[in-house]
Regions:
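NAD(P)H-binding glycine-rich loop region in Rossmannoid oxidoreductase-like domains
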Residues: 22-86, 97-103
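Rossmann-fold NAD(P)-dependent oxidoreductase module
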Residues: 15, 19, 82, 117, ...
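N-terminal Rossmann NAD(P)H-binding glycine-rich loop of SDR-like oxidoreductase domains
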Residues: 1-23
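Mobile cap/lid helix-loop segments that border enzyme active or cofactor-binding sites
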Residues: 193-250
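Conserved beta-loop-beta element that borders a ligand/cofactor-binding pocket
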Residues: 87-90, 95-101, 113-136
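Glycine/proline-rich active-site loop of Rossmann-fold NAD(P)-dependent oxidoreductases
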Residues: 135-144, 169-179, 202-204
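A conserved pocket-lining segment of Rossmann-fold NAD(P)-dependent short-chain dehydrogenase/reductase
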Residues: 125-126, 139-157, 161
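Substrate-binding strand-loop-helix patch
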Residues: 153-160, 181-195
Length: 250
């Protein structure tokens, strides 16, 4: 298959491309640094020429509420129109577990808007909702000396396993629906962040706070965990911290 990866220079895109190539697919990475801009449409037609499948793992460069909404609405609309013109047979999009449960978050509302464009479009699709990545655990806490982090349960996973799951979806028939994938463990967010701090030599102590916000939203124990029927990866947080070293090393 010919596969175009939108967001091909990012964390997931750079992990996904070699997996697809080893499986025998022809891969075209596409991102602004490679001359493809989904916001303006620049380079899209060329990047999608001959593509059977498009995998969209792109992300907004800004998390500001209006900017992130504009990014996902505009880029997704442009991408779907270009795919239809190019005869793409399967649109695979990476989204977020819990996006539809966190209406107070501008970022999550933008992801829901992206999903709505896909489900309302004419290109057959599969939406993959994944949980938060191990690689971003420390970023959740920010730079404070004693960061306050939600004590709600969540279910993080390795970016490598997100890429592996996406690679398994590519050759399948479009589901025209949503599938969820998450880590093998549910644990309090503050505990996961503290483990990441400890493993990386960060001496800060995380303060568990049930009122701490996540992307602008208050969490409960169902907000960020997978639903019934979800897929699960096998790498636990402790195993990832022991083997990955610094984020991005895997």
């Amino acid at each position: 298959m010919n596969v175009t990866i939108i967001g091909g220079s990012g964390l997931i895109g750079t992990k996904l491309a070699p997996l697809l190539e080893r499986a025998g697919h022809r891969v075209t990475p596409a991102s602004p640094s490679q001359g493809v801009n989904t916001l303006t449409g620049e380079g899209l037609a060329q990047a999608l020429a001959g593509a059977d499948v498009v995998v969209d793992v792109s992300n907004s460069p800004s998390f500001e509420e209006q900017a992130v909404m504009q990014f996902f609405r505009t880029s997704t609309a442009n991408l779907l129109a270009a795919e239809q013109a190019a005869g793409v047979r399967h649109h695979v999009a990476l989204s977020v577990v819990g996006a539809d449960r966190l209406a107070d978050s501008g970022y999550m509302r933008a992801k829901v808007a992206q999903e709505a464009l896909i489900t309302g479009g004419k290109v057959p699709y599969t939406i993959v909702r994944a949980t938060q990545f191990f690689e971003f655990l420390r970023a959740i806490a920010g730079d404070g000396a004693a960061p306050r982090v939600s004590s709600a349960l969540f279910q993080p996973m390795a970016a490598d396993d997100v890429a592996q799951f996406l690679a398994s979806v590519v050759p399948q028939d479009p589901r025209n629906g949503i599938v969820e994938v998450g880590g093998p463990q549910r644990l309090p967010m503050n505990e996961a962040v503290q483990r990441a701090f400890d493993a990386h030599g960060d001496a800060r102590r995380v303060v568990a706070d049930a009122q701490a916000l996540y992307f602008g939203s208050l969490l409960n124990d169902r907000s960020l965990v997978t639903s019934a029927g979800a897929q699960f990866d096998a790498i636990t947080l402790d195993a990832w911290l022991a083997n990955a070293g610094t984020p991005g090393a895997r």
